[in-house]
Amino acid sequence: MAVFKPFRAVRPIPEYASRVAALPYDVMNSDEAREMVKGNPYSFLHVDKAEVDLPVGTELYSEAVYNKAAENLQKLETDGICKQDKSDCMYIYRQIMDGRSQTGLVGCVSIDDYMNNVIKKHELTRADKEQDRINHVDYCDANTGPIFLTYRDNAAVGDIVKAWQAEHEPVYDFVSDGVAQTVWVIDCPETIKKLSSLFAGIDSLYIADGHHRAASAVKVGKKRREQNPGYTGNEEFNFFLAVLFAQSELAIMDYNRVIKDLNGLTQDEFIAKISESFTVESAPESPYKPQEKHTFGMYLGGKWYKLTAKDGTFDASDPVAALDVSILQRNLISPVLGIDDPRTDKRIDFVGGIRGLKELERRAQSDMCLAFSMFPTTVDDLMNIADACKIMPPKSTWFEPKLLSGLFVHKLK
């Protein structure tokens, strides 16, 4: 019984949409953000990474940054660059990258659904990162970036979305960094009611990406409830901004590993050691991208190998233990290379599949010495782990394209 409701988005007027829309705050650092906003006073990074408008070296989690974010968000409205829709709407958001499209529905989901596990999680969050987004949402009095959610395919929802796209013109249609971004507004109360009713029949929503933003939005909502003991449950602070994608719309990319050294072993010793848990053979092609679960590409000494996990090296009945990232970590990266905590160990780094396998070769020939190419985690894997109330290992999933910020803002009042 998932709650999915319309809202009055604050969004750019069409002629400014491509200039306002920006990559999410957590895919670049402050210096990169400063470069990206040069010559563009309308970029949403002025809101999401407001330190770009403050002196270099400003403490990122300072009150000055959050105040500036709120000021810049208000300015976009005051200057007429962004306007709030006059009625509650839902929105269709389609992205096309490298010929593959993903289409989602934009609306609001319930903080209660998050707390009672209708919205399921698969990742741990860090208190410091949560607090940053809590402050950001609180000061801006808005959700400024959508949470990326998925759900098991529902044909009726898909039919409504396709029919609306066929019968209506988009309000935004532009290309950003090679990704086509198209948005339709669903402003028909009857269609909105149908969609809300269909989602009420869906048991679970799953966070694909944005665990920190979701946790923060919920904590702000709970805080507002405490400040307003007479709340009805219908106030906007009881809901947060999300884009919902059917499972079949999504493709998770590989999230690859590069390692600094062989932990004191020679190449021959290393291969002998890993052969206890994996079948090691020359890769059928170079570079090598695994074609099925429980197989891995390994680049070492200028050569690609294919690794296959041996029977008995993992528990196939455990959705976490059976993940390829877990198999590699438990049978090779930890026992052979001595990297027990991949979150903190400086001898390991992670390379998103968007960078390609040639990047693995480059890293292994420069600052690292060893690389592993992974078979991508599937959306099914993610859902099974969340259903079992378990946590995925770090760096298990890489989603592309990224959802842009600035096209939809959800005000909490």
Language model features by range: what are they?
Residues 1-413:
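Surface-exposed, charge/polar-rich loops and edge strands
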